[in-house]
């Protein structure tokens, strides 16, 4: 009879793949496994190749692969009719993707649930992890660094997006960029030394953003939130001059709820004090006098535990 007949139970394992074409292509697969393959591709002059391409596939596991050198995306998933509303989850885990011309890991129009976990994505030409126009993706415990666009980019999603426990470091644009769409949670991520903002959230229908550490990014407005319920932008604290005679640290913390001061002494961080931020965005934290050249870390947290910080040296 006329219907979709998927290819079931395919395993692609322990292959060395190189050259100018695509690495591995799967279409209409069911429970395929792609494990321990090494793909060192070359960029063709007229063709945009991909490392691993899974189109309209259910229950696919892509684990422990190394992908580098493609002109386009490293690992690409795209859903159509067969995967729609599938109960079989896709797994993209413990892969290393680097030096691709496009995004490192890109999921587009996803309707089947996917788990993107413990991958390393570095030095790619696009964003490290990109989810566009889909739903049901968990992005957990990945290391995303030194990519030419955003670290993690989410846009036009319809819900069920969870971003937890990722290290997002030294990307050329923002650390995490959330565009228009629905996102469930962004929690427990460490986002630092990205060239622009740590988190950029614009018009996102988001349930929870909490306990993220956002520091040393290029923009003093570490977290930008526009047209988002519950969430406001957060800037680094700005303090008055701190000297050896100072008995408090005073300044402003736009978007902060509390400010805590730590001192780096004998190789250890010591908490000196905490204060609430008032309605004028001002704070005063009482401290003991500190020695000259002591480095103080000023940490501002919002109501949901999202923390931004700045260092000051005692004069």
Q: Where are the language model's segments positioned?
A:
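Acidic, glycine- and Ser/Thr-rich low-complexity intrinsically disordered tracts
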Residues: 182, 187-193, 202-235
